[in-house]
Amino acid sequence: PTTAAEKKNEWIQLFNGKDLSNWTVKIRGHEAGINHNDTFSVKDGVIHVSYDKYKNFDKTYGHIFYKTPFSHYLLRIEYRFLGDQAPGGEDWAFRNSGVMLHGQTPQSMSVDQDFPNSIEVQFLGGKGKGKRKKSLITASFAVRPSTPRFNTDLDYEDEINEEARY
């Protein structure tokens, strides 16, 4: 349904700058709503994602979901990568974040599901050297464990190949 704010093309502020009260956290290995090791927090009006309290990353991918789904929207996001890779984190996950759009709800995800089925706008921070010297933003159709195929003979393991990751 269209809200009054949407009809007027007014911005709806999703984050209140104080807490995560309108958001649901989902961390792999935990039920929806459990913010394991305080992975997501608010400091100085900014949402922070930190794995500082983890001894080992162990594929504990974290996601945060807004309480209300939307179908028509524009997003304005500021992001910044700080610090080092989580201990035991995969190389491809270095400075890797993003926004999942048109995805499943956190409650519908299995406890050990890595990522929600969704469209992902991915933020990749640069390493300063190697394959991914600079930061970049990509978008992908992420439906796991299957790979979408659109009238193609391509045989690829994931939605993007290793070269495209960087």
For each predicted feature, which ranges?
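Carbohydrate-interacting regions of secretory-pathway proteins
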Residues: 1-166
